[in-house]
């Protein structure tokens, strides 16, 4: 934990044992919304949905509003959350894309994050813009019959060091922006189980808003779509349930169009197998479309934790993707 870092570094008997773990450059963290807040039976999985106390009907109206999602996109300051786990400096960990930089490059050596429409995506944090989208969302959601403040259930795993602190500073920062002048949202931090967290919370759809990560399995941008892409009728990887929300009629109108356009963009990109540059540009366009329509919100690279060890981690087995680096 960062709480004891200073004391260990100041102690001559322990300072030489402290180091940061090797950076995981194939992973990225992001925020995502639950587009399926109700129970659903898949052929190979069931979701329980959001508990009634968090008003899933009200949430369904809110998440269907692009103005609501964009209010979050522009209200979130990643630096606040990153400062919890990166007290020595966080600028190198901030991301404005889902795919990390230096993940792969096209035939001309152009980094994937600089390909296609992704090259135009920049940091979004802007309080004034966030409040403009909030005001538009208030008008839109009031007409749709929503009530305020919108409850936003935000769970964390107590077994993960500092995740609870990240949630607390996130709540303070985002509510400080979005509730300035109007009681817009109530971010409700909930503690999930330390064991079986994924099955009990994320894969069960028992949340409304969440932060989590995805790790690349191989060095091609197709691997980065799977938290969000779903084939028709399939559960996918049980992150945001974008397509299922549309198929169940929860997500409608403009947002449904965004979701299905993204699915189509991914399918067309996957079909490009002979032209690497065209393939990368197509995937980059799809990722940019996902972000700019606030279907996901980028956060950061993983901040390597400080550990006490006598091993030289740089002498161990390494690969930027997959599980190879877990072998000592």
Language-model-detected regions and their locations in the chain:
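Periplasmic binding protein-like
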Residues: 1, 6, 10-20, 176-241, ...
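Solvent-exposed loop/turn segments at secondary-structure junctions
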Residues: 2-6, 25-28, 37-40, 78-82, ...
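A generic secondary-structure signal for well-formed alpha-helical elements
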Residues: 3-4, 12, 35-37, 75-89, ...
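Append "and occasionally in soluble cytosolic enzymes with long acidic Gly/Pro-rich linkers
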Residues: 43-46, 50, 58-179, 258, ...
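Bilobed periplasmic-binding protein-like "clamshell/Venus-flytrap" ligand-binding domains
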Residues: 82-86, 136-158, 259-310
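Short, solvent-exposed loop/beta-turn-alpha elements that line the ligand-binding surface or hinge
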Residues: 11-26, 31-62, 104-128, 142-146, ...
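A local structural motif
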Residues: 147-152, 173-192, 268, 274
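Structural recognition of the beta-strand scaffold that forms the well-ordered cores
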Residues: 20, 29-34, 71-74, 82-83, ...
């Amino acid at each position: 934990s960062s709480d004891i870092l200073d004391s260990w570094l100041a102690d001559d008997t322990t300072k030489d044992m402290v180091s940061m773990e090797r950076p995981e450059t194939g992973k990225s963290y992001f925020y995502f919304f639950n587009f399926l807040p109700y129970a659903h039976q898949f052929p190979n999985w069931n979701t329980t949905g959001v508990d009634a106390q968090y008003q899933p009907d009200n949430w369904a109206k809110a998440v269907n509003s692009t103005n609501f999602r964009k209010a979050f996109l522009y209200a979130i300051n990643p630096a606040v959350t990153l400062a919890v786990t990166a007290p020595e400096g966080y600028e190198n960990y901030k991301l404005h894309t889902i795919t990390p930089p230096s993940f792969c490059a096209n035939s001309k050596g152009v980094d994937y994050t600089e390909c296609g429409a992704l090259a135009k995506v920049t940091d979004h944090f802007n309080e004034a813009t966030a409040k403009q989208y909030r005001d538009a969302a208030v008008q839109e959601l009031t007409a749709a019959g929503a009530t305020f403040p919108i409850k936003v259930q935000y769970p964390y795993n107590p077994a993960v060091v500092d995740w609870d602190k990240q949630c607390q500073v996130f709540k303070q920062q985002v509510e400080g922006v979005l509730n300035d002048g109007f009681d817009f949202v109530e971010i409700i931090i909930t503690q999930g189980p330390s064991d079986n967290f994924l099955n009990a919370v994320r894969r069960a759809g028992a949340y409304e808003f969440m932060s989590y990560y995805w790790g690349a399995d191989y060095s091609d941008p197709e691997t980065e779509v799977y938290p969000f892409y779903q084939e028709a009728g399939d559960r996918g990887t049980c992150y945001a349930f974008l397509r299922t929300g549309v198929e169940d009629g929860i997500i409608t109108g403009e947002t449904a169009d965004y979701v299905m356009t993204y699915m189509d963009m991914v399918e067309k990109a996957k079909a490009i197998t002979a032209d690497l540059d065209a393939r990368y540009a197509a995937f980059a366009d799809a990722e940019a479309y996902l972000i700019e329509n606030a279907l996901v919100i980028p956060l950061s690279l993983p901040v390597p934790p400080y550990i006490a060890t006598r091993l030289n981690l740089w002498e161990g087995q390494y690969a930027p993707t997959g599980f190879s680096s877990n072998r000592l």
